[in-house]
Amino acid sequence: FFHELAHSYEKPYYEQIYEDGFLAKEFKNKRNQLKNVISMYEGGRTPPFDFNEINYSKELDDYLANTIGYDKLWKYCAGIFTNPYAATSLREYFAAGFENWLKGDQEVLYRSSPVLYNKLKQFF
């Protein structure tokens, strides 16, 4: 429910959430951290995707979910993303953070995703 509620905020508040580019920059930095972690633990192979792409990609989602697998992805995302699905796109990153906020995990969000935390703070 919270996740879909987050997506309903995106259209009316698009400018506040995305327009300044700061959230996209934070997301890209995290994506590249994840790419480095995956490369390190998956035999030194660089994942065959553009980790700077902020939009959803079914191919990347399949790679993360099926080639890497969520069991390993949870470990690889630790300290980078609040959950593996947050890594799939900028919109999912926002929605996952929104969900964390509503579940009371603001401190984790503050430490791991300060830009996202400050965006969400505007709403609450």
Regions found by a protein language model. Give the residues of each.
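Active-site-flanking segments in enzyme catalytic domains
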Residues: 1-124
